[in-house]
């Protein structure tokens, strides 16, 4: 009887991310923007574990250019009510800095003022964020309850590990 040598078979389990969250070239531009502009006064005090973000590219106003949501989810950017999210245009110019947000974020196909309606759950109820005068409302906790109890079945779900897992980048 001849025994064949045992072969180790390595299985590589690769994370599956939503494609709108994976763009290493864009991530490098975002890192530069965060370090040299948006967080330039904070960067020296940020711990290594706080230097993480996720992003999601989506065209909110049908202009053919993706806006970019940046999700800050580490301790430095989060408080008891939620975390900071940033919305940038395609040129990395700020549109809205959201405070106290707890993803997932729902982007509806319905538009108001030419931009997608956003929904976020806050204190157990959905809040509608509508674009007005160049930005979205920055603090959903002060908004009234949305006129409906759930997002539509057509909403795009952002920053959800179940529906749109986002790649984590460090800077």
Where are these regions (language model features)?
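Short, flexible beta-strand-to-coil junctions
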Residues: 72-76, 90-92, 120-125
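A short, surface-exposed interaction/processing loop segment used at functional sites
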Residues: 86-104, 139-147
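Short consensus segments that form the blades of beta-propeller domains
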Residues: 44-46, 75-80
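Acidic/hydrophobic-patterned starts of short beta strands in beta-sheet-rich repeat architectures
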Residues: 62-73, 112-120
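Flexible low-complexity loop/turn motifs enriched in small/helix-breaking residues
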Residues: 2-60, 65, 166-171
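Beta-propeller blade repeat segments, especially FG-GAP/WD-type strand-to-loop junctions
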Residues: 16-27, 31, 80-97, 128-135
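Acidic, small-residue rich beta-repeat scaffolds with periodic aromatic anchors
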Residues: 1-25, 108-171
């Amino acid at each position: 009887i001849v025994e064949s040598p045992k072969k180790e078979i390595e299985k590589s389990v690769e994370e599956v991310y939503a494609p709108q969250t994976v763009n290493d070239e864009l991530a490098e531009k975002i890192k530069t923007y965060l370090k040299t502009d948006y967080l330039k006064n904070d960067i020296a005090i940020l711990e290594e574990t706080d230097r993480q973000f996720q992003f999601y590219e989506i065209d909110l106003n049908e202009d053919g250019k993706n806006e970019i949501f940046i999700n800050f989810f580490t301790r430095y950017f989060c408080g008891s009510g939620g975390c900071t999210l940033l919305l940038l245009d395609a040129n990395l110019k700020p549109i809205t800095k959201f405070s106290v947000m707890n993803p997932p974020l729902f982007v509806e196909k319905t538009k108001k003022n030419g931009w997608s309606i956003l929904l976020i759950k806050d204190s157990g109820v959905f809040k509608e964020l509508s674009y007005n005068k160049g930005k979205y409302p920055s603090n959903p906790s002060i908004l009234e309850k949305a006129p409906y109890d759930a997002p539509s079945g057509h909403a795009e779900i952002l920053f959800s590990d179940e529906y749109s897992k986002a790649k984590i980048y460090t800077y």
